Amino acid sequence: MACVASSTTLISSPSSRVFPAKSSLSSPSVSFLRTLSSPSASASLRSGFARRSSLSSTSRRSFAVKAQADDLPLVGNKAPDFEAEAVFDQEFIKVKLSDYIGKKYVILFFYPLDFTFVCPTEITAFSDRHSEFEKLNTEVLGVSVDSVFSHLAWVQTDRKSGGLGDLNYPLISDVTKSISKSFGVLIHDQGIALRGLFIIDKEGVIQHSTINNLGIGRSVDETMRTLQALQYTGNPDEVCPAGWKPGEKSMKPDPKLSKEYFSAI
């Protein structure tokens, strides 16, 4: 698979704090440790891990996964709000989705992992076209489950070495996976996101969404065309036929008036 995250099972206390290990052999945890060190217990752990590993290898080769069915944020509904850390201009910043309401359209796209293969081709393509999105009063936001430190390291790596170089928009860190989950793109057993893309209007409403599997990159041209069509149809008297681009003939959403369009094609 082009982008795969490995996982390690941790034994921890319910608290997020880390406590120093106790050296006393009378500690209640000793019996638990003895259980783990017994031949039958360790064999069970090994066999369980082997089964998970074999499934992971199969997924890597297939370049495709089956996501769990969550409640997806549907087109026409409000986009789930979030606030998260991000990297922009080689600095750590805060990004809150609702800050764009009433101001800008937002293209929010998810990608699986930093330092992978398909992902940088998409991320840099959106960056190279950022000025065109700015002219359409639109902000671009990229999201993955990586930390801001990973984002920063990737941005500081030049493109010829598989890095991103400087970007013209923020990369958001979703280490808690809460954003990916709320937008219905999280692959639960791998802890990474599918290639989801959402166009959100100035009222904070999702107007367009696409979700690609891991091995398939997205088209900036098609995203741009869709955004232009969405903004054009802000006029309630016009709709856009298939493949419509700015300057081409649109259609009236009326049984009689639409005949003018069909008679001209």
Curated annotation (Swiss-Prot):
The lineage of its organism: Eukaryota, Viridiplantae, Streptophyta, Embryophyta, Tracheophyta. Residues 1-65 form a transit peptide. It comes from Spinacia oleracea (Spinach). This is 2-Cys peroxiredoxin BAS1, chloroplastic. It is found in: Plastid, Chloroplast. Its EC number is 1.11.1.24. PROSITE patterns: THIOREDOXIN_2 (PS51352). One of its GO terms (cellular component) is chloroplast. The active site is at 119 (cysteine sulfenic acid (-soh) intermediate). Belongs to the peroxiredoxin family. AhpC/Prx1 subfamily. The keyword Oxidoreductase applies. GO terms for molecular function: thioredoxin peroxidase activity. Its main location: plastid. Homodimer; disulfide-linked, upon oxidation. It catalyses: a hydroperoxide + [thioredoxin]-dithiol = an alcohol + [thioredoxin]-disulfide + H2O.
